[in-house]
């Protein structure tokens, strides 16, 4: 990146005109899709009848809140993004959107999502969505990410809250089921992101981000990945014997957990650079499949319970 581009990021001027695609990129669409999916599962497993219009409204508000968090995150991390190859093409490092514009965009969407959810659905869900945005933007982005190697561990709480917000939107209360979903995502986050950090450690080191591989080294990170994966597999399987989720979920969680554990062990075992790189990438890719399949199973079980009375 040129000196001119670096200076542009520091002071925030526009280098070229932004288009709709640039503002969509600020929303972090991939992260939004995961948030929508996990929130949808939170809605589906919630008890009772939730009006479809309110359900759609809740999902949209949660999605917009997640997008707002992404925009604010990019506005506050323009300096970091410009130094990392993975993020250098984002709108702010490219000079397509200024930091001030991203901040205004994110703040506007934050207020819109929280107020709409509170007014149209319930204020418990609105308050929890506001807390989720605050936690991600202030606690994680401004503090944890820049100052501690445990940034992903603690900060993972923000990414784990959407299904809880959805459940509260549907019921107006809290229960063990959404808390179990929270714990699954919370303990899934470290192995997922540390696998990424292992093969992107040079990027993080260059940007001065204290990710675990940068601070503690790859060996310590591999051990932490394995330990968190063991906890994840145990926590994900627990709802079945505890009677919260059905046997189909239990079998799927054990099968997926075996796969997750296998890839984590491979990451722990393989230290040679080329083999380690492949193992890290495989764990990262499988972890996405793991979470999707696990939550999809819950969603399918919930849908089956809904339509069963209509069939029989």
Curated annotation (Swiss-Prot):
Catalyzed reaction equations: heme b + (2E,6E)-farnesyl diphosphate + H2O = Fe(II)-heme o + diphosphate
Gene that encodes the chain: ctaB
Note in the entry: Carbon 2 of the heme B porphyrin ring is defined according to the Fischer nomenclature.
Pathway assigned to this chain's UniProt record: Porphyrin-containing compound metabolism; heme O biosynthesis; heme O from protoheme: step 1/1
CDD domains: PT_UbiA_Cox10
Keyword Transmembrane in annotation: yes
Its biological purpose: Converts heme B (protoheme IX) to heme O by substitution of the vinyl group on carbon 2 of heme B porphyrin ring with a hydroxyethyl farnesyl side group.
Stated family: Belongs to the UbiA prenyltransferase family. Protoheme IX farnesyltransferase subfamily.
Enzyme class: transferase
Subcellular location: Cell inner membrane
GO molecular function: protoheme IX farnesyltransferase activity
GO cellular component, one term: plasma membrane
UniProt xrefs under Pfam families: UbiA (PF01040)
Entry membrane topology: Multi-pass membrane protein
GO term, biological process aspect, one: heme O biosynthetic process
Membrane-spanning intervals of the chain: 34-54, 56-76, 119-139, 152-172, 179-199, 225-245, 248-268, 283-303
Name the record gives this protein: Protoheme IX farnesyltransferase
EC assignment: 2.5.1.141
Keywords for this protein: Cell inner membrane, Cell membrane, Heme biosynthesis, Membrane, Transferase, Transmembrane, Transmembrane helix
Coiled-coil ranges from the UniProt annotation: none
Annotated InterPro entries: Protohaem_IX_farnesylTrfase (IPR006369), UbiA_prenyltransferase (IPR000537), UbiA_prenylTrfase_CS (IPR030470), UbiA_sf (IPR044878)
Domain of life: Bacteria
